[in-house]
């Protein structure tokens, strides 16, 4: 974000060339007719009457026993989860090192087998009782001779009885989820600020040099790599791939979404989330959000100003919207929910992307989410607010103060919500 600000500030205080009058310039003749802007601004989004007229159909809520990937599942899609109408704080616990000037806490907690797993900004993995918050174990992943300040970023995933962690130290670690014992460590040569997705005994993640890696979950041996377009300036957003039917879909900092064959890493199709005609400062950094695979369709959005729906198997574009977001879309029933960088929460028709309803969330702080549970869309904000929004009509039905900043989306498992605050406080709510 600082890059966009600094570029915008270069000309402050100087007159623009267009403001200097040319005495020899002839008056321009304006042609008749309606003038339609070529570049659609984020503010031009509005509710489509035909889409709004159709009632939103939510699938019945289902209780998920676990949340094993950063996006909930390997496809980053969980549908409609079970949760009570109101949430109340049950317990809170300190999980380690929070955000600081050295790095941000960005790893989403996981839930499985009665435990909540966290990775703090210092590179320490810990497990806590989901029932009480009591610590079960903790393991530092900081290599010897490291200062301990480069381990921020990375994330966790669970698959085939193993817990996997990526770290800013450029390592991937296999861990026993019951004891915290390290099973193996694999060096990848570059820091890994993003989270992994584990599926079918394989681990997929993107390192800071825009390389997608596939490792064997049993021993950490590299199976294949695929290089994306390097991007020197990024938002350091923490995303993870989506795994579907024979393909893994990865998001790269330059704004590219690429589908690869999970067997050999060959690219099947490629899409860009950057608006080529974008002139706003926000479009300079194109970091995408976590992609979602649902019903044979890939949904993706990014900071470059574009949201797309494409066929998972062929990459055929189904629809496009001009929309700027760093948050993973949530797909359920016939609707896709997404919040943009200005705090507009939208319900889009899954078939064509038309806006069914739009709600401006309160305040000016950044919002993270949504997660659909108990008929509501749940989001947390950088100023410490938790809101519940009716998924059918967009009305804000509940607001809770968490008392601390939050930059990580909520997690729901076993009918309980878990929120990891920026100061490394884990909060459980029923």
Predicted regions and their residues:
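C-terminal motif of bacterial Sec signal peptides marking the signal peptidase cleavage site
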Residues: 6-9
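Bacterial signal peptide processing site
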Residues: 11-14
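Blade/loop signatures of beta-propeller domains
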Residues: 29-47, 54-90
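Extracytoplasmic beta-rich repeat domains
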Residues: 91-110, 138-157, 183-199, 222-244, ...
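Structural signature of WD-repeat beta-propellers
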Residues: 120, 167, 207-208, 252-253, ...
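WD40 beta-propeller blade core
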Residues: 126, 173, 213, 258, ...
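Short loop/turn segments that connect beta-strands within beta-propeller blades
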Residues: 129-132, 176-179, 216-220, 262-265, ...
């Amino acid at each position: 974000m600082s890059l966009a600000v600094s570029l915008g500030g270069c000309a402050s205080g100087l007159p623009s060339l267009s403001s200097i009058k040319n005495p020899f310039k002839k008056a321009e003749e304006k042609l008749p007719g309606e003038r339609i802007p070529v570049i659609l601004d984020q503010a031009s989004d509005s509710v489509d009457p035909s889409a709004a007229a159709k009632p939103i159909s939510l699938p019945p809520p289902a209780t998920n026993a676990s949340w094993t990937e950063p996006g909930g599942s390997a496809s980053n899609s969980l549908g409609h989860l079970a949760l009570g109408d109101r949430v109340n704080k049950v317990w809170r616990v300190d999980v380690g090192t929070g955000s600081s000037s050295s790095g941000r806490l960005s790893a989403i907690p996981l839930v499985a087998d009665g435990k909540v797993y966290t990775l703090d900004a210092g590179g320490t993995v810990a497990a806590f009782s989901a029932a009480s918050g009591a610590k079960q174990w903790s393991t530092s992943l900081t290599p010897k001779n490291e200062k301990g300040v480069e381990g921020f970023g990375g994330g966790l995933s669970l698959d085939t009885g193993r817990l996997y962690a990526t770290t800013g130290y450029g390592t991937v670690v296999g861990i026993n989820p019951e004891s915290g014992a390290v099973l193996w460590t694999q060096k990848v040569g570059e820091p890994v600020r993003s989270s992994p997705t584990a599926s079918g005994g394989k681990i997929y993640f993107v390192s800071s040099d825009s390389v997608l890696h596939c490792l064997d979950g049993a021993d950490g041996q590299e199976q294949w790599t695929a290089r994306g377009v390097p991007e020197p300036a990024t938002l350091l957003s923490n995303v993870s791939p989506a795994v579907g039917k024979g393909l893994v879909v990865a998001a790269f900092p330059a704004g590219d979404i690429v589908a690869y064959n999970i067997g050999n890493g060959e690219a099947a199709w490629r899409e860009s989330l950057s608006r080529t005609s974008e002139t706003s400062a926000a479009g300079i950094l194109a970091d995408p959000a976590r992609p979602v695979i649902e019903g044979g369709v890939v949904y993706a959005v990014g900071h470059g100003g574009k949201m797309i729906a494409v066929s998972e198997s062929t990459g055929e574009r189904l629809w496009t919207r001009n929309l700027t977001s760093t948050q993973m879309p949530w797909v359920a029933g016939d609707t896709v929910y997404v919040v943009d960088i200005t705090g507009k929460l939208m319900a889009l028709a899954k078939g064509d992307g038309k806006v069914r309803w739009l709600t401006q969330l309160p305040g000016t702080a950044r919002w993270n989410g949504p997660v659909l549970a108990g008929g509501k869309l749940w989001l947390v904000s950088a100023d410490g607010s938790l809101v519940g929004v009716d998924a059918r009509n967009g009305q804000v039905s509940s607001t809770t103060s968490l008392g601390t900043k939050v930059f990580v989306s909520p997690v729901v498992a076993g009918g309980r919500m878990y929120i990891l605050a920026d100061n490394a406080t884990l909060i459980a709510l029923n």
